[in-house]
Curated annotation (Swiss-Prot):
This is Caffeine-induced protein 16. It comes from the Eukaryota. GO terms for biological process: mitochondrial RNA catabolic process; nuclear-transcribed mRNA poly(A) tail shortening; polyuridylation-dependent mRNA catabolic process; RNA 3'-end processing; siRNA catabolic process. SUPFAM superfamilies: Nucleotidyltransferase, PAP/OAS1 substrate-binding domain. The gene is cid16. Residues 1105-1159 form the PAP-associated domain. GO terms for molecular function: RNA uridylyltransferase activity. It comes from Schizosaccharomyces pombe (strain 972 / ATCC 24843) (Fission yeast). Pfam families: MTPAP-like_central.
Amino acid sequence: MLFAKLLLKPVQILFAYAKAKSKEISIKEANLLIFQDETDNLRKISTPNKLAVSLAGGLKALLSSNQLCHAFHYHNKKIRLVDTSLNNLPVPILLPKLINYLLARKSQKSAAEWEEIERALLSCCKRSKDPSILFPTDVPCSLDDDVSFLTFKGHKNHLENRSFFHDSESDNFKVVLSNCAINSKEDNNLVTEDRVNLGAKLLLVPVQNLIKLLKVSKISVDLAVIDHSFQDQKLTLEVGNGGLEVVKLFGGWIRILESECLGHVFSFKKTMKRKEVALVNRKADIDTTDLFIALRQLVDSKFKSYGIKAQKHAINRISKLGKMITSNHAEEKLTTIPITEAKKESVSNTALIARKNIIRERKYLSRMFDIFEHIDSYFNHEINMLLVDLLLEPLQVAFVYKNLARRWISLEEIENLWLKVFDSSHPLGKSITSTLQAIGTRKILTQLSINMIPRYNQDNCSAGDIYILCFSENCWLYSVLQKTIDHWVNENVELFYKKFEILKSLLIEDIANSTFSKEVSLNSSLRWYCVAILVTPLQLIINHLKDKTEMLSLDAVMTLILGKNTREVNSSIEELKITDCLSFLLEHNIFNTFLVYNEGIVKLNKDFDDFTPLNLLKCVNYSLMEFQKNSTFDMLEKLYEIGREIDMSKFSTLKYNLQLPNVDLLKESEAVSETKNTKNNTFILKSDLKEEERLTNFTIEEINKHKAIGVALRKLLEEADTSSNFSSSNNHVLDSSKHTVSSASTSSRKFIENYKSLESIGLTSFVKDNKLKASKELQKLIEENVFPKNLILFIFRKCVIGIKSFEKLQSYVFTYYCERYPKLILKRVLRFLEEIGFITSQYPRKLTDTGALFLKHPSEWGVLQHTFISSNFFENVPCYISLEQSLQNFQNDIRPDTVRTTAMKAIIKKLLKSLRKLEGPVKIACFGSYRTGLMTKNSDLDLVIYSSKEALLPYYDRVKSIIKNEFSNVMPIRGARIPIIKFTGQYNIHCDLSFDNLLPIHNSDLILNYSLIDERVKTLLMLVKYWASNRLIDKTHHAFPSSYTWCIMVIFYLQQIPEPILPNLQKLSTQYSKIVRDNDYGNVNCWFNRDTECYRGSMQKGRKNIALLLRGFFCYYGLTTQYSFDWEAYMIDISSSQLKRKSTEFKDCPFVVLDPFLKKKNLTKALTQKSVKVVRYELERACRILSDPKCNLDHLLDPLIQ
């Protein structure tokens, strides 16, 4: 730490000098600047700083390093700044990069050399007369390496209010513990009183927990039970696992409990089979101070009993645990110091924390509650989160205004709009206005241009719909706005760093000073909801008063809104309590601008004649604001309670299907289009109207086209009804006519039922539980693994191009499955497909009209309706019980048994033994599903052989001959990009052996580390892999994405969902490197963060179950909604934290999935135009099936469900 802090000032001075020069400077000029004596105090660099630069390798090595490439560009002995817009290099950003640079240098030197360097630096610093000139002004003037100095002077007051230890039972004990800080100035190998106190403090918590456990039990307890209890119940309280670490450090519970220091507390009995412990006096209360003193004696005796090396290890370990607890588990001393007026000065963090503590005790509305939830992040210097929360609402207001205005609007117009909306009456007005002024409104509007956001077609939305889209978190536009501003803030976060404290203090000041009634009355989210809900009913009332009657009673108004003949359609509106809200507002004469209420009668205001939708929206919004400003607390509370009962998720699905007698007003705004339904007059969006027309056309044309097929199937069904059912048979040979007719009976009955449903509602042939099943004999063979279930689908798809002969079919099957199935099995499958009418009975076998209809792409039918597939992928439908239940036992059902895993290990061992015949050392490594832990019962074994001395590919033929002597079904594939040898081992385990290709090992490790972050990730990866394998779309040599590619798609999806489950493990790959040699791409950086422990708690924000995540995966990639992935515009890259547009080299590729390590490699480049269509069909099919509430996993994997 001292080394890095000494480098700060030279680097910052060099940065300021280069910025002042405004041009490139030579390395010679830079060396003169740093090492020449300077009279100017601002540029004066002390001897310790110069020594640090020299020991760090010199300026050339420092400035050309990867760690400082964000600030300096070094080329041909010239130095220039990367970003000239920066005024300086902030210490919080620069210091970690210097630490990383020094760690890289340290790895290149021996421990003795590095200790000598540190000793020289420390000695030189101590000789310095004024230590303050060694460091920048915002870095503590201390030579200590304590972890607390990672936080700088701006937060010193906050650190002083932190308490290292928590409350205890005795004042004396508090005094003792307050002196337990680690003094880093002392020798690390010295046993000091502070370190003994720290070890005793760490031991105190687990010992107290052990006492509690023993008091509950009436007899002595086995130590094994105690360890298990501590691990399961996590009884380590405030210090996490630090106490248990110290227990292990001192030899475990046995050594500790055997000590004489704790003899007055515990009685320990050791037998041959058990090690039991009990309390000496279970009823007596043990004083915490006495226990702490005993533990101090114990720790002191342990230290003194150790040798030099063991003592040094124990002291270092306890010191690290103490530092970790100091930085992570300390509590703030919350005071009640009032916050001061913050204009240009930063308010102390102590005061902000006090206000934060106060406001958390109140009740607030949803939008403000989101900001309260983020306050803790603001205090951790999350300026990007603060700016996103403050800038989101201005962007929402600007977008709504632009769409309702229907014209180009000037920047001045939006500036004036923001001044009016976010005035002093707004609860966060001061904070938002200060943020806009600090950053610059023009800069925000230029960077966050409305054109950056996908345009919403105004013709396809009703008047109030834009409010729902912008302000309801369930709608797509809200998330788009949030992502847009989040992306811009993250890119420019360094520019706002100085203004962070001021903005933070203003926000806390606004929230803490606002009263409850003020917040309820002026909260924007509630007002937008009320406006959006009330506009359409108010239009209905105004039209009725203009065209039919001049007045209406309040009861008549409510009847008009609900509709007399449309009770079923509008029952959901009644559930939303809209009538209660409207009647309440009318009774209090809120809308007197255009509606007058007097003695139970509602009339039009004669002075109001502008009833355009935009003007009506403005008036409703203004009326609500005026009412809420001037109303009493009781009235506000009543409105708030009504507003809270409005279910916005239900409202957003209604799409304003209200019965409106006069639609002239709505035709003026071109917001909706009128269409007549057979049951009632409803208004639906134009996009829905187009889907309805396509649906009707499909129903008429397709049913007429296949009418003859339906008649033939009905006759077959009538004949089958007279025949007998299946007779049970133990052999696997289909009997003659009875089995044939009954098989056709069962399948045809289901198929006709599907046609009937198709005829009535015009949807796909998959309707709930109506599905085609194989005959009982085929089903039985599938269950016994005589042949795979997807063999039926494989043969069915091959009939698209036609199967010329039976021998050709055998060749197809062997090429794909690498196994020769008996002729009888293949003939049974052909006969079954022939009997249900899917393929022809003569060679060449081709699809019939029925089979072609079954494989037809659903988008050509227009059947993907919003009624079947919700726009919200994560809609928590309670009917997904059957799917969730089928997924619970999924992993156990497909996981390989111990026999298969043992056989795989035996194959590796046998292969390694056989390859010893080659010259030189040969190593074998596994990759793929065996390494990632995603194996199933049918998974292959992927192996690679390599040598550290030479390439093994020249020994290809010799290795092939060795394998032929040991294994069966050997198939060499020499012409592939990566030559492999396929063979089969024990228990029919298929193996692939490659040469010198080490990159897949790191690919597999990356998948493994992602799966360790959350238990749902592994399950979802196995589900998608298993689904792709069953649907025959997981083999690259058949022009489909590989299993590895599907895993990458799953990981990218879990990174992009609204509440991400997975982080980016390659985020810091530009600072670290792990080079692996690849034959085609040269040196490849395969570094990623393998420490996944830190992500397990922070990333698990949303607890969506597997069923919803699986459905969301297929909807994300398979549909073409606003929420879905745009294959034409973007590409998948899990090493990037944000969506990336297709580069020019991939613009002609339909799918682009980048390799995490090879940035120029598209994992889906082998896909053809036909295979892309098949993949999209399969994704859409899965989404359709999972959209049915009664679906389960069998439906998803069944080859005969469309």
